[in-house]
Amino acid sequence: MSMSDPIADMLTRIRNAQMVEKVSVAMPSSKVKVAIAQVLKDEGYIDDFAVKTEGAKAELNIALKYYAGRPVIERLERVSKPGLRVYRGRNEIPQVMNGLGVAIVSTPKGVMTDRKARATGVGGEVICYVA
């Protein structure tokens, strides 16, 4: 059976792994998932990630991050879904928790944070909120 929303699956795997305090989580890899993982790493929400390729299948391993025994990611919420895509122009990109969190946006210039998209002057599809 094919998966209807692989990005939502990725976010759910991260959320579930952090609830049971796993050190890392593995999932099927794709270019968009790797780009999202890179943004999460750059913003300090995860420790590291690696893509392991075996034959035709690639697996994305994400090392989760904790602070004082609690997960660094408190909120991980999918915004744009396959049934209802959410696009925002460069002046309409939302702030998460008044700038304390991050909105991950897929733009023509790649996947980036809301702050970088505003600074670059591009809009795009709001993938998720992270706080």
UniProtKB/Swiss-Prot annotation:
Name of this chain's protein: Small ribosomal subunit protein uS8
Any Pfam family the entry gives: Ribosomal_S8
Entry's family note: Belongs to the universal ribosomal protein uS8 family.
Protein origin, superkingdom: Bacteria
UniProt GO cellular component terms: ribonucleoprotein complex; ribosome
Quaternary data: Part of the 30S ribosomal subunit. Contacts proteins S5 and S12.
Gene Ontology process terms (BP): translation
Keywords carried by this UniProt record: Ribonucleoprotein, Ribosomal protein, RNA-binding, rRNA-binding
A molecular-function term among this protein's GO annotations: structural constituent of ribosome
Function: One of the primary rRNA binding proteins, it binds directly to 16S rRNA central domain where it helps coordinate assembly of the platform of the 30S subunit.
